[in-house]
Each structure stands twice: as C-alpha cells, then as structure tokens.
C-alpha cells in the first residue's frame, strides 16, 4: 500500500469514528454495532449499523477498502482506457433514515480510487459528496445545508460549489419519474484536477462538513409532532430512495459488480417503505408542496 493510500485510509477510518460518535450522541439511545468483514477477492471493511434509536430508525456508516486485478464495468465504463488495470478503492459511505418524517434522510460518501498497471503511471481520483432528502421541507434547513456545502468548497475556488451542486442535481435524478431524489448538495467524481495534496484536502473538507450540515437540522426537527398520515407519506417517499439506489447509484453498482459485501452495500435501504399505485398528493397539501417547491432545480443561496 502506497503512502498516499495509507494517508487516505487513516483519514477515512477516523472520519467513520467521528461521524458514528456524533450520531450516537445526537440519538441519545442507540449505538452502532460493528461488523468487520473481509472480501475473498481482496480487501475488507467495517460496517457499522444503528437501528431503532430514539431518533434514527436505521442508519449505516461504512468503511471499505477493496482491491482487485481488474476494474469492474461500473468504474471503467466512462474511462475505457482503464479497463484491465488493477485497482484499490477506499471509501466511507453513510445513509441515515430517521423515524420522524420532519427529519430528512441524509447520505454522504467520500472515496478514493487508484488504478495501476505495470510500467505505467498510476491513475488516481477522488469522488463523493453529500445530499439531503426531506419529506416535509423547511427552507431554513435547505439553505443551511447548502451554505455549509458552499463554505466547504470555497477555499478551492468560487466555481467549485456551483459546479458540484449542479452535478448533484443532475446525478440524484430519477429519470424514470423525472423528479429529483431530494434537495441536493454536492456530488463529484474523477477529482484529480489539482495535485494530490490539494485533492485530498478537498475530500477532507467535504467529509468533515457533513456533521456540521446535518446535525443542526436533526436537532431542530427531531422532537416535532407528526401524524400517522405523515409517517405513511415518509414511507411512500422512501420508495423513491430505494428506486434510485437500486437502479442508478454508482456506489451500489460498483459494490455489487466488484463482488462487494451485499449486506454492507444494501444497508442504505430504509427499513419500512411503501408503494401506492399512481398515488398523488392532495392539491395544496404539505405533501404536494414537497414536489412543487422543494424538489425543483433551485438555487437555495440566491436570496439568502
């Protein structure tokens, strides 16, 4: 393992520890259970799952470090010149599904790939981001989420936040329903336009920003009263989350195609979901406002 890979791995393991500690403290009841695993083809990881807490219904914060002799199709499809290279992939990926429909679901991921071939220079890149999926949107929360994202990107250039915000909006879009999964945030891949140290610093800035972006929203909403109808709507909207993760998500596809650990890959799925045939929200309702106002291509920082 190279010095670069060792540095990334040390950061990711520490990030997983810090995020789990912060989420446990915010929940106040449940604790993460760790399941360390090894991958027969090379590598392993630490899956950490929290369930049935006071705030978190189900959540997972996973670290993985896998390697192999050939990049899987999901990783080489848009870079065919890398087909046949050996690879190492390291990352932390998390999804948090709260009980309360007024608390959004959150997702974050930071990852590092390096593809190598004897006699040639290694090719490396970073990817990741974070995004928010509210069920009952609150503008204050959306602005806060995007403000933290913008500030994390600011030291790396004025164009970084708008570019990766737009990429997030494009990526987390359910094409078969023509609707966004949530209110976005940041998404990026193939980050190597800077030197390694700057690229690594950028990834650390994004990874470290997640808790600052998410926990203030959780604190504001976790005690809000909700009805059985609102809970049903949350479960209905979770169906969209499942659809995206199983049909489009690059991380899910990479994990399954590379022989990753299925339980760890699918820990992102919510525990209770519902689908209703051709269900539509009542006009003028809070549920209708989610898609009409919040799930749109919006610049949340334009007037704030």
Swiss-Prot record:
Site (Important for dimerization): 176
EC number(s) on file: 1.3.3.3
Biochemical pathway: Porphyrin-containing compound metabolism; protoporphyrin-IX biosynthesis; protoporphyrinogen-IX from coproporphyrinogen-III (O2 route): step 1/1
Positions of region (Important for dimerization): 241-276
Subcellular localization, as worded in the UniProt entry: Cytoplasm
GO terms of molecular function: coproporphyrinogen oxidase activity; metal ion binding; protein homodimerization activity
Binding locations of substrate: 93, 109-111, 259-261
Entry's Gene Ontology cellular component terms: cytoplasm
One Pfam family matching this protein: Coprogen_oxidas
Active site: 107
Amino-acid positions noted as binding a divalent metal cation in the UniProt annotation, renumbered to this chain: 97, 107, 146, 176
Enzyme class, broadest EC rank: oxidoreductase
Quaternary assembly: Homodimer.
Biological role: Involved in the heme biosynthesis. Catalyzes the aerobic oxidative decarboxylation of propionate groups of rings A and B of coproporphyrinogen-III to yield the vinyl groups in protoporphyrinogen-IX.
Family: Belongs to the aerobic coproporphyrinogen-III oxidase family.
Name of the featured protein: Oxygen-dependent coproporphyrinogen-III oxidase
Classification lineage: Bacteria, Pseudomonadati, Pseudomonadota, Gammaproteobacteria, Pseudomonadales
């Amino acid at each position: 393992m190279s010095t670069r890979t060792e540095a990334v791995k040390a950061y990711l393991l520490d990030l997983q520890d810090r995020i789990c500690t912060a989420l446990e403290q915010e929940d106040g009841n449940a604790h993460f259970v760790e399941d360390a695993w090894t991958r027969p083809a090379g590598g392993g990881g630490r899956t950490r799952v929290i369930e049935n807490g006071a705030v978190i219904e189900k959540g997972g914060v996973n670290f993985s470090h896998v390697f192999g002799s050939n990049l899987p199709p999901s990783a080489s499809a848009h870079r065919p010149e890398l087909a046949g290279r050996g690879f190492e992939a390291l990352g932390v990926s998390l999804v948090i599904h709260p009980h309360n429909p007024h608390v959004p679901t959150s997702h974050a991921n930071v990852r590092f790939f390096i593809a190598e071939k004897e006699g040639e220079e290694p090719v490396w890149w970073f990817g990741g981001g974070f995004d928010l999926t509210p069920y009952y949107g609150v503008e204050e929360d959306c602005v806060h989420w995007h403000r933290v994202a913008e500030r994390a990107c600011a030291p790396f250039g004025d164009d970084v936040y708008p570019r990766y915000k737009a990429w997030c909006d494009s990526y987390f879009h359910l094409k078969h329903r023509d609707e966004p999964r949530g209110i976005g945030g940041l998404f990026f891949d193939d980050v190597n336009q800077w030197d390694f140290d700057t690229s690594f610093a950028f990834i650390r800035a994004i990874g470290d920003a997640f808790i600052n972006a998410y926990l203030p929203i959780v604190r504001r909403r976790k005690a809000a009263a909700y009805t059985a109808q609102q809970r049903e709507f949350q479960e209905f909207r979770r169906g969209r989350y499942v659809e995206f993760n199983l049909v489009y998500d690059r991380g899910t596809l990479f994990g399954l195609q590379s022989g990753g650990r299925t339980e760890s890959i699918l820990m992102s799925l919510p525990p209770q979901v519902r689908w209703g045939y051709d269900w539509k929200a009542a006009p003028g309702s809070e549920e209708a406002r989610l898609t009409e106002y919040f799930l749109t291509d919006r610049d949340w920082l334009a007037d704030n």
